[in-house]
């Protein structure tokens, strides 16, 4: 009997999920994920966004060049884009997927974000903390716009 060799492939991790309630309707909240001027108010220092399937998704988030492309854009209900860090060997540009759902609840919007395909638990933990923090900022920004 020979001992098994540990796999060198990263194990898939559970998706990161975060949800917030924003005091504004979905048509006010949705553009914060598609309009570069609004993205720089809550998550990025600079943004280049072409919000159509196949369009560029590029944010500079605290010195990290997040890069990908829009996969689905269904205003004001759902947006999905690929995500990764330009130049990263562990999480290359476009190798994970972020889905954001916008659900009207009275005059508010419940935003539910799911980030899939992160390669390691360390990336999962850092992205969970990051998304939770940035969505908290979004609550104040988009809520004041509604």
Regions found by a protein language model. Name each.
Residues 10-11, 59-61, 91:
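Short Gly/Pro-enriched turn/cap motifs at secondary-structure boundaries
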Residues 2-3, 117-146:
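A conserved amphipathic terminal alpha-helix motif
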Residues 47-50, 63-110, 116:
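Hydrophobic-ligand binding "helix-grip"
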Residues 17-18, 24, 36-69, 78:
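Short beta-edge strand/loop motif at the mouth of beta-sheet-based domains
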Residues 32-33, 73:
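Conserved catalytic core of Hanks-type protein kinase domains
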Residues 1-17:
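Short acidic N-proximal helix/loop "leader" segments that mark the beginning
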């Amino acid at each position: 009997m020979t001992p098994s060799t540990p796999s060198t492939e990263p194990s898939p991790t559970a998706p990161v999920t975060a949800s917030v309630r924003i005091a504004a309707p979905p048509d006010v909240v949705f553009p914060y994920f598609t309009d570069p001027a609004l993205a720089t108010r809550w998550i990025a220092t600079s943004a280049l966004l072409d919000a159509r399937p196949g369009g560029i998704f590029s944010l500079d988030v605290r010195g990290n060049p997040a890069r990908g492309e829009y996969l689905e854009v269904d205003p004001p209900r759902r947006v999905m884009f690929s995500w990764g860090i330009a130049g990263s060997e562990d999480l290359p540009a476009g190798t994970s997927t972020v889905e954001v759902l916008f659900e009207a609840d009275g005059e508010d919007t419940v935003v539910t974000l799911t980030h899939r395909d992160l390669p390691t638990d360390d990336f999962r933990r850092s992205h969970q903390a990051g998304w939770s923090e940035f969505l908290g900022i979004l609550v104040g920004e988009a809520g004041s716009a509604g």
